[in-house]
Regions:
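Short His-Asn-centered micro-motif
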Residues: 212-216, 241
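Positively charged n-region of N-terminal signal peptides that target proteins for export
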Residues: 1-4
Length: 488
């Protein structure tokens, strides 16, 4: 199904009553295609029961690729439950030998090559585990799987191979990645709302910018826009999740025109003892030595460098310009830039349309953000413009207030009353006093220890209360939207 750029697909969603089926019964349907989110929440007993079911199924139907894939997803998740016991996980995989048996049953199939790539499987059936031997053929599985990728591939598969190509082939011919992302885009699996959000992020960046992303989820949409839809092709993307692979970092540096002296044997990066320090040095070097403007997303500031965030001195040099943060060693009027982005660059009217609800029972993307949460980001990041517009541009203030109200309407229609992230809960309240409007209350998480005495618990509650505050407050509209009118 091909999809036009920035089209929001409206769908009627029927609410279905909860089934009395158990999870194991539901996931034992022979017609079912399991995705990773189906098995994440299962306990070990449920996983073992499902393993037995699907193992019996592939024994009876040895050529059924979907059944083998289901068995692999279950066994792979079960091996993860060994936690830090790597030997136990390895012994489990060797005992079950799912991928080895798969190679005998469906050799050189897409399913086998995908599973072999994802499972650290040695080349020969029965061969003892040997990381060096596996590493030599690892990429062969990926390349062959990409060649065999079926038309009904899941979003997770598209993103798995996009991540592989980003890491392995940045700076090289982009034909393979472009073809893959074109198929992903045309599949309809990548949400239009997410694509619009990435577009607006790019719209706010100056020409030739470098964008620093935390995970591939921060750049998939931008790459679709760039390689498939042909917009913002001047931007360069650095994904920290791929920075473990030195050729990838070198390719990004070459694209950005940064000195390769960074990689010299006596450099600070080469001498770094911890990967965390390597990542910190990479970002610092990009920011401080690039002649190109450098940006990141607001959520990445605290998630980069293994979720520890940027160092405080570097963080202080990033200025909010709307959806993105811009690095500058010198202070400047970033609020003026944010106003320019809102008034001239961002396309915001799509936020008034009905969001297509995320159906996580079918969404197999590796990196997910609900469409309504993306919309909520606009409110958090643009709300500080409201006082300026109220004082200097009443018409613009009324427009932005109306836009905010419509976003809240959409969120409330999805029965969402708030979000939790960044150590805080954000509660959305409908307020009738003074006229119908919305408020967002930011409340820090209350973390209590069972060993806390009553005085400690009370102190924590007092601290939480002191930090709880209203951070967004819309104003009543002259003609309230239908959602608000229904709450009178």
């Amino acid at each position: 199904m091909k999809r036009a750029f920035f089209t929001i697909i409206l769908a009627a969603v029927a609410l279905v009553g909860a089934s009395a089926q158990t999870a194991v019964e539901r996931l034992s349907d022979p017609s079912l295609r399991l995705i990773k989110s189906d098995v994440w929440s299962l306990d070990t007993l449920q996983l073992d029961s499902l393993y037995d079911y699907w193992n019996d199924y592939v024994l009876a139907h040895p050529k059924n690729e979907q059944a083998w894939r289901n068995l692999f997803e279950i066994s792979n998740e079960r091996s993860v439950r060994f936690g830090g016991n790597m030997e136990g996980a390895r012994a489990y995989k060797q005992q079950k030998n799912v991928v080895g048996r798969m190679e005998e049953a469906i050799p050189d199939s897409y399913t086998f090559n995908y599973c072999a790539y994802e499972s650290y499987y040695p080349k020969k059936v029965g061969e003892p585990y040997d990381w060096a031997a596996y590493a030599r053929v690892h990429n062969q599985y990926a390349e062959r799987a990409i060649e065999l990728l079926p038309d009904d591939a899941q979003a997770h598969d598209y993103e798995t191979w996009a991540s592989y190509l980003i890491t392995q082939k940045t700076g090289q011919d982009t034909t393979q990645l472009t073809d893959l992302l074109t198929r992903y885009f045309e599949s309809g699996y990548y949400p239009a709302e997410a694509l619009q959000y990435h577009f607006n992020e790019l719209q706010g960046m100056d020409e030739g910018a470098i964008y620093i992303g935390h995970t591939e989820g921060d750049i998939y949409g931008k790459l679709i826009l760039q390689l498939v839809l042909g917009v913002h092709r001047d931007k360069i993307f650095y994904c920290e999740n791929s920075a473990h692979y030195r050729p990838y970092i070198e390719a990004v540096f070459q694209q950005a025109g940064l000195s390769m002296d960074f990689f010299e044997p006596d450099s600070a990066w080469a001498r770094a003892e911890e990967q965390e320090e390597e990542y910190r040095l990479i970002i610092r070097y990009i920011c401080e030595h690039s002649t190109r403007p450098v940006y990141t997303s607001a959520n990445c500031i605290n998630n980069l460098i293994f979720d520890k965030g940027l160092p405080n001195d570097l963080k202080a040099c990033f200025y909010n310009e709307g959806l993105t943060m811009h690095y500058s060693a010198k202070p400047y009027d970033n609020q003026a830039v944010k106003r320019r982005n809102v008034e001239e660059r961002y396309r915001l009217e799509y936020l008034r349309l009905s969001f297509m609800p995320n159906d996580y029972s079918k969404d197999s993307r590796r990196f997910k953000q609900p469409n309504d949460l993306l919309a909520f980001n606009y409110l958090l990041l643009l709300n500080d413009l409201m006082p300026y517009y109220k004082a200097h541009s009443p018409q613009r203030h009324a427009w932005l207030n109306s836009l905010f109200t419509d976003v809240f309407d959409q969120i409330m229609r999805n029965n969402v009353s708030g979000y939790g992230f960044g150590g805080n809960m954000f509660h959305i309240n409908v307020v009738t006093e003074g006229g119908l409007h919305y408020e967002v209350v930011q409340e820090p998480y209350l973390i209590e220890n069972p060993e806390d005495d009553e005085a400690t618990r009370q102190r924590k509650r007092d601290e939480q209360k002191a930090k709880t505050r209203v951070i967004i407050k819309t104003e009543p509209e002259t003609h309230p939207s239908p959602s608000l009118r229904g709450r009178e």
